Amino acid sequence: MLLITIYAIPDAIHNTNINLPSPKIWEMLSKILLNYIISPGFVSPLMVFSLCAMIVLSVFSPHSVKADTPTDNSPSLINNKQNFDFSPSLLGQKNTNIGDKISLNGRLFYVPWSQRGINGVIHTGLGDTSLRLAMGVDLLNTTNPHQQPIEWFSSEAPILNTWLTGIYRYLDITDFAQKKGWKIVINRDTLTLTTPSAGISNIRQGKQSWGDRVIIDLDRPTPWQIKYISEPPKPKVPHPPKPDDPTKPQGSQPKPLLDDLTKPQGSQPKTLPDDPTKPGKPQDKTTVTPPTQEWHITLDAQISPTLLQQKLSAGNQLKSVNIDVAGKQTRVKINIPLGWRPQVFTLANPNRLVIDIRPDFLLERNITWAPGLQWQQRYISLGKDRFPVFFLEVNLRQRGIKLRPIFTNYPQSINGTTSLLKIADKSQVAGAINAGFFNRVNQLSLGAIRFDNRWLSGPILNRGAIAWNDDGDIRIARLNLQETMITQGGSRLSVIRVNSADVQDGISRYTPEWGENYTPFSDDELIVTIEKDKVTRHNTGNTKDKMTFSIPKNGYILVLRSLPSAIEQLVIGSNVRVESETNPPEFNRFPYIVGGGPFLVQNSQVVLDAKAENFNAVYQRQTAIRSGIGKTVSGNLLIVAAHNRAGGSGPTFAEFAQIMQKMGAIEALNLDGGSSTSLYLGGELLDRPSQTAARVHNGIGVFFQP
């Protein structure tokens, strides 16, 4: 009878305006009841009774009556439709419902979310680093990756349980949301979260010895976001700024902002300096107004017309502050010195949002994010200067953690650039940092990349590199790759580059790892094709001809630049073989290598010699945001982004070497820095607003398997 009822109900009301559970749920109920009939001891009578009640409620509940079906883009679908998944797996112990978007009070944010069943109760989790950006929830220090204390208009820090996937750490907001009166509805891959309406009761401001403070009084806790908007246009100068890497072509285009990706080809990208938040220096003595930058703090709170008309004044470092209304949100627009960031936090009893404008903006953190993976933020002092440093400390010997080079397009292509956010998302990593140098014009790597024992890009210019394996062994040193072609006649020809976009006179070798084809970098190149260790073809290549040459899968090609005499030793039909070794020799046993430079620390001592790695003198003295990687005495890996000193510019190479040394690195390497610097964890950049980060070619990713 029960089975008849289950199968009859859908047919009986097929043409009515009553919502039914999904076909999968009907199938699940049928199977459970069939098990009861066949084996009553397997399924309890109480479960059968509960299932019957569920059927009645799901069919005849007033909430099941269909409204006019809106389109997928309709706000009513996002805000009103309740589509909970009661599948068997959801009521188990593992993730089922997942998505990457939340609609927060009607505004869409990219926030990973997940639902799982725990003891028969559905729990909702939001990605921790994204929740911080979307709602202003501050993550406090913890040594337990499974419990995360937070600060959000709290007198005492609530502790949220967490669960980990290979990419995200979810904070279980189920109980917290209920206490705060949040409403959660799931619609496909979007979680709709509605918080109680809030209002602003007052706005106060005051000058401080260290800067300025703005206080916004609220009648209840409410979500808030902070966003870097822009800096004013810079005046034209006769001498353009030097590139991040002087080895990059002088005619290269600057890295575009992420917004420029949507522009049609041929449009000019905006110039993005090494560090968009770097303090600007006056261009000449006539400069009166120092450069500023604009930030917006948006609150999901309404403000009265009277309070909106309140005039707010500039302060010590607060150049201007304005309030406007956008829908149900209130925006606080501030202009502050270039290189500064607002420090924003919340207080309870009464509820307040505090905006501090001060040179030392960093909120220090020490969070065990996962077993073997620690996220830290703190100031490192060098004399009177204090540098904000963001870093991950990774134990490569921890089960479930692996380190790999990551790329924009590989294995489809070795070239291409995009944001580290996109590279990390595509690679499905938990953490990452930008890594090696690259050519901005052809978007090819300039330095060592070894992946699974294959050279995707060979070392250049005696520059530093890091090597590692899955046993947790790490080695950092200056690296050279020495290859020799041995001809059938016994001649030895030196190969100066392997799979490299660094064009030098001599012989370069290009293997299938470079791609299916090779396009000449210069005119009058001699192309020698080797298949199965035998010379099979000679060709001449020129850039003007735009010709490409196939790289055989069973061999490689040799490119002779300004060395025509070598062709006489490579006779068609003759046999050749290649000898290859690294210096230091032990690098050859490591399957993974990424190049950077300069080499900073060895045996806990600073060994910086940028000249030996062919960095020019001007570049050596430059200050900029820095990316780096190091090894501690315990064998852990430090993945580091060092930003502008409080009230000043970023570190020089020498200062960065000292920073790495003070952090406990016994070996350390500088990576591509400036606008390229990006440190990623759990779906977001930790160290900078994402729109200020430039496109990069490659990175180093931390893969995590719980």
Language-model features: where?
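Loop/turn positions that initiate beta-strands
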Residues: 570-579
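Zymogen propeptides
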Residues: 61-68, 202-238, 287-291, 304, ...
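N-terminal secretory signal peptides that target proteins for export/translocation
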Residues: 1-39
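Conserved, well-ordered active-site substructure
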Residues: 442-460, 464-468, 593, 600-666, ...
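Short alpha-helix capping/helix-loop boundary micro-motifs
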Residues: 556-569
